[in-house]
């Protein structure tokens, strides 16, 4: 790979899929988080497509939770993409580094560098640039860093003008940097000698040692980035993704009567008359939107129905859920799978578990079980 900047067929990647997806409940009570649709496509499929586009032919999924469902659904997609998917099963949670050691025989089978990424990340994936940057500096690892508005919420990365990382500072109270770890890495196989098959944090246990030895570099990400592991960030990420689509692939966006701004609609969805859809809306397969509905900054998942004259803002409507007539939903409300909201109700910030029927308004954010 480093001999050939055009990323060869020897490229491999490991995606950290492990966790239970608790931050994205109630959606993840029905579906493993990597299979939840983001902009009408499973989160993980965005990453797989970007890896394949960069020449990757083998992807290891480090899984622990509901692996069978993922295998079943992803094998079909992998075949279409022409990528070999290997499932590496954790019997106990191994953190962010342990899964690399568990997959060591596969990752060390070639001397070429390999990608590692966190399954919650959506961005303009820079895999080709990352390979070139990594090969140019010739050290053991490179992490992608991205600029954020509020660095005090994160651990920040300090590095010199060449990209050589000098330090990591966890949630700084005073401004030292606004660059954070974006959860996308490339490593030489020699990094595997630093990791054992046990619960290990790559950020807290492996990176500091590599930094001390000047073996870890940072590459700046251009374009948008979001960790979409929780509903608020899922919706923000959707807005950023649709904006990127507008710049790069605008024909994919929906244009029709009543559409405002960036909207993505599956061809099988039906939208009634007198609706106002957008900005920043995704509507999935087999969705029915009746007449006079207003939707903005929301995701409507497969098979959901929104009855006439309802108003939705900043919400996620789960698979096969039904929103009644003259309903108002806002405040980062998430309806799980197969939820029924009766007519003329108000829901503000509700997290509604699957298969529930809501017959009274929910004026304050709460979990409805």
UniProtKB/Swiss-Prot annotation:
GO biological process: GDP-mannose biosynthetic process; larval lymph gland hemopoiesis; protein glycosylation
Signal peptide range in chain numbering: none
Positions that bind GDP-alpha-D-mannose: 120, 227
GO cellular component: cytoplasm; GDP-mannose pyrophosphorylase complex
Primary enzyme class: transferase
Keywords annotated in UniProt: GTP-binding, Magnesium, Metal-binding, Nucleotide-binding, Nucleotidyltransferase, Transferase
UniProt cofactor note: Coordinates binding with substrate and required for enzymatic activity.
Sequence segments annotated as region (Hexapeptide repeat domain): 254-369
Reaction(s) catalysed (UniProt annotation): alpha-D-mannose 1-phosphate + GTP + H(+) = GDP-alpha-D-mannose + diphosphate
Regulation of activity: Enzyme activity is reduced by incorporation into the GMPPA-GMPPB mannose-1-phosphate guanylyltransferase complex. Allosterically inhibited, when part of the GMPPA-GMPPB complex, by GDP-alpha-D-mannose binding to Gmppa.
Pathway noted in the entry: Nucleotide-sugar biosynthesis; GDP-alpha-D-mannose biosynthesis; GDP-alpha-D-mannose from alpha-D-mannose 1-phosphate (GTP route): step 1/1
Cofactor(s) listed in the protein's UniProt record: Mg(2+)
Catalytic activity, EC: 2.7.7.13
Gene Ontology molecular function terms on file: GTP binding; mannose-1-phosphate guanylyltransferase (GTP) activity; metal ion binding
Organism domain of life: Eukaryota
Protein residues bound to Mg(2+): 120, 227
Active site per UniProt: 171
Cited function: Catalytic subunit of the GMPPA-GMPPB mannose-1-phosphate guanylyltransferase complex. Catalyzes the formation of GDP-mannose, an essential precursor of glycan moieties of glycoproteins and glycolipids. Can catalyze the reverse reaction in vitro. Together with GMPPA regulates GDP-alpha-D-mannose levels.
Quaternary structure, from the entry: Component of the GMPPA-GMPPB mannose-1-phosphate guanylyltransferase complex composed of 4 Gmppa subunits and 8 Gmppb subunits; the complex is organized into three layers, a central layer made up of 2 Gmppa dimers sandwiched between two layers each made up of 2 Gmppb dimers. Gmppb catalytic activity is reduced when part of the complex and binding of GDP-alpha-D-Mannose by Gmppa induces allosteric feedback inhibition of Gmppb.
Family label: Belongs to the transferase hexapeptide repeat family.
Name of the protein described by the UniProt record: Mannose-1-phosphate guanylyltransferase catalytic subunit beta
Naturally occurring in which organism (per UniProt): Drosophila melanogaster
């Amino acid at each position: 790979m480093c001999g050939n900047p055009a990323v060869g067929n020897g490229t491999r990647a490991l995606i950290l899929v492990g966790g239970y997806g608790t931050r994205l409940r109630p959606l993840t009570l029905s579906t493993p988080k990597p299979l939840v649709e983001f902009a009408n496509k499973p989160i993980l499929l965005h990453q797989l497509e970007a890896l394949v586009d960069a020449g990757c032919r083998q992807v290891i999924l480090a899984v622990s939770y509901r692996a069978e469902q993922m295998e079943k659904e992803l094998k079909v997609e992998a075949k279409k993409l022409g990528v070999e998917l290997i499932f590496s099963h954790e019997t106990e949670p191994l953190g962010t580094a342990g899964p690399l050691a568990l997959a060591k025989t596969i990752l060390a089978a070639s001397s070429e560098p390999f990608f590692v990424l966190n399954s919650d990340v959506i961005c303009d994936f820079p895999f080709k640039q990352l390979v070139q940057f990594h090969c140019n500096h010739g050290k053991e690892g490179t992490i992608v860093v991205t600029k954020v508005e509020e660095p005090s919420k994160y651990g920040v990365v300090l590095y010199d003008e060449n990209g050589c990382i000098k330090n990591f500072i966890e949630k700084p109270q005073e401004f030292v940097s606004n660059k954070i770890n974006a959860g996308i890495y490339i490593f030489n196989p020699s990094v595997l000698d630093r990791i054992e098959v046990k619960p290990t944090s790559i950020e807290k246990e492996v990176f500091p040692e590599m930094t001390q030895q000047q073996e870890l570099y940072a590459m700046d990400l251009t374009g948008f980035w979001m960790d979409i592991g929780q509903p608020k960030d899922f919706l923000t990420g959707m807005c950023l993704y649709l904006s990127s689509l507008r710049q790069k692939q605008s024909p994919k966006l929906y244009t029709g009567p009543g559409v405002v701004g960036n909207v993505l609609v599956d061809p099988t969805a039906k939208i009634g008359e007198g609706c106002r859809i957008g900005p920043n809306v995704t509507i999935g397969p087999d969705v029915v939107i009746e007449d006079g509905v207003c939707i903005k900054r929301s995701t409507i998942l497969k098979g959901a129905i929104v009855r006439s004259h309802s108003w939705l803002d900043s919400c996620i409507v789960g698979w096969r859920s039904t929103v009644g007539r003259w309903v108002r939903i806002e405040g980062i409300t998430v309806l799980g799978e197969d939820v029924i909201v009766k007519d003329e109700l108000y829901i503000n910030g509700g997290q509604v578990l699957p298969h529930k029927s809501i017959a009274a308004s929910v004026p304050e954010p709460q979990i409805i079980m």
